[in-house]
């Protein structure tokens, strides 16, 4: 854990129940980035884990363009009952950052899908790196987990660190995110 600085733990009462939070500061040549872990105090040997990338528009503003905010809420609700943790990675817009995400949204408003929009502004379909999540799992000594995801890249990344059983997290489509969800399934291989 040479590149991680770990904060103290603090209580976080939520609408889903009481959690604890802890911050992990990732240090690299570009500076530092803080990631948050939201967890139940006593989680089982095979906990529920949600690897969630930051989505300000979905998580905080309730955007209907994506499934992020609803998926996070569903995960917190299940984890509060069954025990586990959310690893909240600061990788806005599948790793392209908020500024670029807004530019990609503008292209989506013109009819381009999420992948086309990213590529038009010079990015791959997904720029995220999940290596830090593996270090966080090691910190909590998690060797086995039930991963709440539909993303095969997350499964493959975390299988390097622990035994992973996938549990799907299906968010209902709406008129604003239906095309987005179809692209995730057809072009990104999501298990929807």
Curated annotation (Swiss-Prot):
Question: So where's the catalytic machinery, residue-wise?
Answer: 126, 128
Q: Which CDD domains match?
A: GTP_cyclohydro2
Q: Which SUPFAM superfamilies match?
A: RibA-like
This entry's comment on the bound cofactor is: Binds 1 zinc ion per subunit.
Q: Which GO terms describe its biological process?
A: riboflavin biosynthetic process
Cofactor section: Zn(2+)
Q: Which residues bind GTP?
A: 50-54, 92-94, 114, 149, 154
**Described purpose of this protein according to its UniProt entry:** Catalyzes the conversion of GTP to 2,5-diamino-6-ribosylamino-4(3H)-pyrimidinone 5'-phosphate (DARP), formate and pyrophosphate.
One Pfam family here:
GTP_cyclohydro2
Q: Which PANTHER family match?
A: 3,4-DIHYDROXY-2-BUTANONE 4-PHOSPHATE SYNTHASE, GTP CYCLOHYDROLASE II-RELATED
Q: Does the keyword Magnesium apply?
A: no
| Stated name of the protein | GTP cyclohydrolase-2
């Amino acid at each position: 854990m040479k590149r991680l600085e770990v904060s103290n733990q603090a209580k976080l009462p939520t609408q889903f129940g009481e959690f604890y939070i802890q911050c992990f500061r990732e240090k690299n040549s570009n500076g530092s980035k803080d990631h948050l872990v939201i967890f139940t105090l006593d989680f089982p040997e095979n906990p529920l884990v949600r690897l969630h990338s930051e989505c300000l528009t979905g998580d905080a503003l309730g955007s209907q363009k994506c499934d992020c905010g609803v998926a996070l809420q569903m995960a917190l609700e299940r984890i509060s009952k069954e025990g586990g943790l959310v690893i909240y990675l600061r990788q806005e817009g599948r790793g392209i950052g908020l500024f670029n995400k807004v530019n990609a949204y503008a292209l989506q408003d013109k009819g381009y899908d999420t992948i086309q929009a990213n590529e038009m502004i010079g990015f791959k379909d997904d720029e995220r790196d999940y290596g830090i999540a593996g270090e966080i799992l090691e910190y909590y000594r998690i060797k086995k987990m039930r991963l709440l995801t539909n993303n095969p890249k997350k499964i493959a990344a975390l299988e390097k660190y622990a035994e992973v059983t996938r549990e799907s997290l299906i968010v209902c489509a709406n008129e604003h995110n239906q095309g987005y969800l179809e692209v995730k399934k057809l072009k990104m291989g999501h298990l929807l």
